[in-house]
Curated annotation (Swiss-Prot):
Family the UniProt entry places it in: Belongs to the poxviridae poly(A) polymerase catalytic subunit family.
EC main group: transferase
Catalytic activity of the protein: RNA(n) + ATP = RNA(n)-3'-adenine ribonucleotide + diphosphate
Protein name: Poly(A) polymerase catalytic subunit
CDD domains: polyA_pol_Pox (cd20919)
UniProt EC number: 2.7.7.19
UniProtKB keywords: ATP-binding, mRNA processing, Nucleotide-binding, Transcription, Transferase
Keyword Transferase: yes
Quaternary structure and interacting proteins, as annotated: Heterodimer of a large (catalytic) subunit and a small (regulatory) subunit.
Upper taxonomic lineage: Viruses, Varidnaviria, Bamfordvirae, Nucleocytoviricota, Pokkesviricetes
Organism per entry: Molluscum contagiosum virus subtype 1
Record InterPro entries: PolyA_pol_cat_Poxvir, PolyA_pol_cat_sf, PolyA_pol_nucTrfase_Poxvir, PolyA_pol_nucTrfase_sf_Poxvir, Poxvirus_polyA_pol_cat_C, Poxvirus_polyA_pol_cat_N, Poxvirus_polyA_pol_cat_N_sf
SUPFAM superfamilies documented for this protein: Poly(A) polymerase catalytic subunit-like
Amino acid sequence: MNGAQFELLREYLGRPPTLNQYFIFKPQARAIQRIMRFDTDVFFALIKKNKKRFFARIGGSASEINARVLSYFVKQRATTKVGRILSIIELQSVLVNSYTEIMGVLTLPAPPVYNSVVRLHYCSMERLAEEVLWSYNVAFRSGKVMGRHCVSNLVVHVNKLMSEYLRRHNRTAICYGSYSLHLLNSRIEYGDIDILQTNARLFLINLAFLIYFITGRNVLLLKVPYLKSYIVMQDEEGRHIIDSFNIRQGTMQNVPKVLVDNIYIIDPVVQLMNTLKMLSQIDRLEDLGERMAKMRLRLATLLEYARYHHCVSFGGGARLRLHMRLDAGARIVLVDTRCYGLGYRECRCYLDEARLLQDISKLNADAAVVDFEAVSNSVFLIHQGIMYTYFSNTVLLRSEDAIHDVSERAVCAHITLYHLLVGCNYQELLADLLNSLVSREKCPVVGVVARDKKVGRHGVIDIEKDVITH
């Protein structure tokens, strides 16, 4: 037994470790040493600056914040449970090793903001956007309220921090969704801020602690099994605060992006393709009638961006020439792509991801698989004239065996998305897709092919209960 390590553990635990505790915590000695040397006074000063800048209207006094900070760094002394102590060590280590770099820098003087995007006349597309949405409004509401509508009152404060975070960390974090469109068109309202980043877990743990130290409120971090690399933060009542997808640095570098006011946003045309895919999801389509005004502004902004930056001529272009059918037994949408020079004659859109991955493994072509992670929500493989990919939304039917126009355009958007992401062969397909958004006839949805059902357990990080399961 090492005497120095024993004394370190005794000081950290506030009591002599048992023999069992000594050997369990011994591998953590270096991390514990860093925790013991951590300057909580400097840390407290950073927390106060963060409060003044981002949470000025809520939270406790300086003495209350300091008490929470000091209390957390001796929290391990109040329990003898080995699992809880190991969780505390891990969470304290996150603060010690990353808080200053991730959150502390947000209090430094801000760099100059560069307006690096052309401001367009987005209202010119509102009439077209309205026609598109009315032709899409073909689903009856089920009355089910989705969880995404339950928003925490912490969101407004977190958003202020997030906008600065995206500016300071624009090499590792990128924005999409309504806030990114607000940066292009200030008329667009936004709720929470949607982000992709390369260190989502570390960031959200630090944010959870910042909220706790300032307000005393305990939030949860949930890892959702049916969304890859996705973590959502919820308040005590299960209301949404913020979520984030984690992506690799390679994906961050390769995804098409636009710099707006020092914030990188995912290329709006990529976002337009994902919007068209989303509208094939039956619950999203059911919401359309109530969200028409908001969606009109967003869609008009995306369409005008596509018109200007990709020279799309609306009203005079050809309509889609992709022909597709559903193999209901295999749950695959088969798309004939020979009318376009895409580099393959057929696209097979699997509705079950596990089946796709199984079939790809049989082809022995793993090296050719392209994966843009959460940006595309699918891998892509082109092999012997066939594209293999996964379509993650429901497929809507206009008759028992015919795919609805809404889902046909969504599948086409998924294919176009791939070509936008790799930067080739998308111009003609994109133009035809966008000129086909208004349906010639408004057919009701008569059937729905369910989306892929993912199984698994939620992972949890709960700093109040010292629980880490992801």
